[in-house]
Structure formats: structure tokens, C-alpha cells
């Protein structure tokens, strides 16, 4: 919803064939799902896909660049070959580091899910995560955890807010992500909102009337 206002596009297509935009859109979703399946919980913050008719470029932004670049270097090269076999075109995969992972809603949501799956108290996890986000310069953050919290029989929703999260305007740079935490006692839903900077307000312009003679 905020693409073109505070968010840049994460997919670019250059098409000179008879393929429609829907075909490229479906292929883009398959590429992203394939990346998440190949590198699960690898601190991937964002994936940018640029495609032409014969080749493409994939830029992976991650907070754990050592996991992808060194530990999984052979797997990364194998991943490029798998992309060519699966989608029929050559892809160049680039990996870039996220300098401040605490300002990425996806990275923080994965961190919360890992803590919940390790049976850490959800209140402690949420409050510690909010503190990390605010310390890195965010204006505000909101965390929502839902379902059988604390391993109780009754499902409920708990919300934790620190600072300001203005969802009423598109001009605020708000990062959002949601996922599921697979715990021993069931599936928990995790949602994270992070406001990086506020909307800019401009003073109203007043027109001066010409004096009458």
C-alpha cells in the first residue's frame, strides 16, 4: 500500500514477450517462496527481483550475511542452478547485509518466533524485542501475539506497544510482517509493526489578498 510513497518496489519486470503481468507476478511469488524454503530463518529482511525475458537478478538483504555467504556458499551456487532449472533463465544472486536488523519487521518477527518456539515467556520476549527496536532509533513499535499464550486452554490476543505507530497515514515509514511460530502446544501468530520515521507535516499556505484602492 505504501509503494511509491515510503516504500520502493521489490520487483521489476522488463517484458518484450507475449507474457502478461500476471505471469510475471506468479513467477515472482514462486521465486520468493523458493528462497524462503531454501534458506529458512536466515535473517532475510527483503528480496528484490529484477527480471528480463532471458535473465534476472535477485538481491537478498539479510542480517546474517555470514550464514549465506560463507557457511552456505556452495548451497548458494547450487541455488542459482536450481533457479535456472525451475524457471528456465539465468539468475545472478547478490547478497547484501542489513546494517540495522532491529528496524526490520521481518527479522524481528522471526526472532520472536524462534524465542517462542524455545518456550520463552511471550511477555518477556515481546518487551525485550520492543526495547531493542527503540534503542536502534525507531519512533515506535507494536507487537501482537495470538492464540494459546502461556500454554493455556483459552486462546487470546496480547498487544505490546512502545512509542508511536501511526497507521492512519501513508506518509509514515512503517514496516510490517506477520508469521507463525510452531510451538509444542500449537501455532502462535506473530505480527510486528515498526515505525522508522514520522510523516512530514507542512504548514498551510495562506494567500494574501491584494489591497483594494
Regions found by a protein language model. Give the residues of each.
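Generic solvent-exposed, charged/amphipathic alpha-helical segments
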Residues: 32, 36, 77-84, 113, ...
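N-terminal, positively charged regions that mediate nucleic acid binding
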Residues: 1-72, 76, 187-201, 208-213
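Short, charge-patterned binding micro-sites
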Residues: 49-64, 90-110
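Short beta-strand/turn micro-motifs at beta-sheet edges
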Residues: 45-48, 80-82, 179-180
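Positively charged, low-complexity, intrinsically disordered RNA-binding extensions
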Residues: 1-2, 7-11, 95-213
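Ordered, soluble secondary-structure elements with a strong preference for glycine-centered loop motifs
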Residues: 18-29, 59-78, 102-107, 115-124, ...
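Acidic, low-complexity central loop/insert segments
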Residues: 68-94
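Short secondary-structure junctions
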Residues: 36-46, 84-89, 134-138
Amino acid at each position: 500500500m505504501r509503494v511509491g510513497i515510503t516504500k520502493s518496489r521489490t520487483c521489476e519486470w522488463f517484458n518484450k514477450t507475449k507474457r502478461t503481468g500476471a505471469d510475471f507476478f506468479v513467477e515472482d511469488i514462486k521465486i520468493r517462496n523458493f528462497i524462503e524454503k531454501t534458506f529458512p530463518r536466515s535473517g532475510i529482511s527483503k528480496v528484490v527481483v529484477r527480471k528480463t525475458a532471458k535473465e534476472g537478478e535477485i538481491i537478498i538483504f539479510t542480517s546474517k550475511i555470514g550464514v549465506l555467504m560463507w557457511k552456505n556458499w556452495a548451497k548458494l551456487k547450487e541455488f542459482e542452478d536450481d533457479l535456472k532449472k525451475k524457471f528456465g533463465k539465468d539468475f545472478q544472486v547478490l547478497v547484501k547485509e542489513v546494517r540495522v536488523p532491529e528496524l526490520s519487521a521481518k527479522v524481528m518477527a522471526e526472532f520472536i518466533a524462534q524465542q517462542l518456539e524455545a518456550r520463552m515467556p511471550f511477555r518477556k520476549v515481546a518487551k525485550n524485542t520492543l526495547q531493542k527496536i527503540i534503542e536502534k532509533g525507531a519512533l515506535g513499535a507494536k507487537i501482537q501475539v495470538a492464540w494459546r499464550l502461556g500454554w493455556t486452554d483459552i486462546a487470546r490476543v496480547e498487544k505490546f506497544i512502545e512509542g508511536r505507530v501511526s497507521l492512519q497515514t501513508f506518509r509514515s515509514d512503517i514496516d510490517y510482517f506477520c508469521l507463525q511460530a510452531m510451538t509444542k502446544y500449537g501455532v502462535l501468530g506473530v505480527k510486528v509493526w515498526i515505525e522508522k520515521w514520522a510523516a512530514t507535516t507542512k504548514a498551510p499556505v495562506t494567500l494574501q489578498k491584494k489591497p483594494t484602492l
